[in-house]
Amino acid sequence: MNLTLKIWRQANADATGSIETYPIENVSPDMSFLEMMDVLNEQLIGQGIDPVAFDHDCREGICGMCSMYINGEAHGPDRLVTTCQLHMRKFKDGDTITIEPFRANAFPVVKDLAVDRSAFDRIQHAGGFVSVNTSGNTQDANAIPIDKHDADKAFDAATCIGCGACVATCKNASAMLFVSAKVSQYALLPQGQVEATDRVLNMVKQMDEEGFGNCTNTGACEVECPKGISLENIARMNREYLSANVKG
């Protein structure tokens, strides 16, 4: 396939960015989107042009690094996949593809398509864990009965990879789906009950301090989430937050 790529280029967070156009030829439909970007960068280097900076790591849909806004959709036109799992067979010969970074005030551009998502790390650090010494002195997890429905819901929430697609696709740049997934995965399990009150209060507080917008229930985040995280988690977090405020 021969394609035209319109790519956001920006030297750093303080620089003025712009869309640059690059033609690319002989793209195999079997390539992943990132492999196509690798080929483009080889082409640019050969022409003496600075290669396009973009995040990537596992290339298996696990790490959440490969976040790109492709033709107006987080991770591109496919559903329940990350950018690295998107294949070029989803596009046609002669297509023009516009590629931008995930845009949000809380995700400043580092360079080109790479953004700083450390805001998610700080939210996670505020309470997205169970702070218990588990160095060999805890009872076997199988000794604590957990309803399968709750276990499945907790597992579904825990599949969140923190890619930021929910923020990028939300008109308010809300991080509610991400935070609610991290709250829910512990709210549904007995191990998470001890710190439940502090967890939800601290994580929501940190989310607000990072500058994310609020949720207005458009549902766009669930649609474009590569792991299909449900809006049910936002409702659960709201209940946890209300309960924590009443207790506090």
Feature locations, PLM:
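Ferredoxin-type iron-sulfur electron-transfer modules in oxidoreductases and energy-metabolism complexes
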Residues: 31-50, 97-248
